[in-house]
Design a protein with these regions (language model features):
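The catalytic Nudix box helix
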Residues: 34-67
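Conserved N-terminal beta-strand and adjoining loop/helix that marks the start
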Residues: 1-17, 35-38
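Nudix hydrolase/Nudix homology domain
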Residues: 25, 29, 94-133
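Short loop/turn microsegments at loop-to-beta-strand junctions
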Residues: 4-5, 44, 99
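Recognition helices and adjacent regulatory flanks at domain boundaries
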Residues: 14-16, 21-24, 51-55, 59, ...
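Short connector loops at helix/strand junctions that flank enzyme active sites
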Residues: 2, 10, 29-34, 61, ...
Length: 133
């Protein structure tokens, strides 16, 4: 099974999501999803998260907080989720992958029709923990 890291990025009670490319060759094309990607051989989870966020946003948070691990049999992978607070101005983030990025409140996320269920579930879980970080 592939190992995957995902970041739940938050700022001012909003969450940053990526509109994935609309390519049939990728998983969950044209959906609002979390930033992240595959862990390469010999790479640690935090190292993989740093690489992915640097590639996708030209940014990496000062701290990552572990949230959960989930085995996804549908996509044959194990996802490790981290929470990251974005302390830089929004204009400092540069989209390197995907069609777009956008900040959403948790209520806005619930209204999206093209978001994988696991993204919604993990955002809800993170939302409960953020005030304790």
């Amino acid at each position: 099974m592939r190992e995957v890291v995902k970041a739940i990025i938050y700022k001012d009670q909003k969450y940053l999501l990526q509109l994935r490319d609309n390519k049939p060759s990728i998983l969950c094309p044209n959906t609002w999803a979390l930033f992240g990607g595959d862990v390469k051989n010999g790479e640690g989870f935090v190292e993989a998260m740093k690489r992915e966020l640097t590639e996708e946003l030209s940014w990496f948070p000062e701290k990552l907080f572990y949230l959960a691990k989930y085995k996804d049999s549908k996509f044959d992978c194990i996802n490790t989720y981290y929470i990251a607070h974005c302390e830089v101005p929004e204009h400092a983030l540069v989209l390197g992958e995907g069609q777009a990025m956008e900040w959403f409140t948790i209520d806005d996320v619930m209204k999206l029709t093209n978001t994988p269920d696991m993204v919604v579930l993990m955002l809800k879980k993170a939302h409960k923990h953020i005030n304790n970080i």
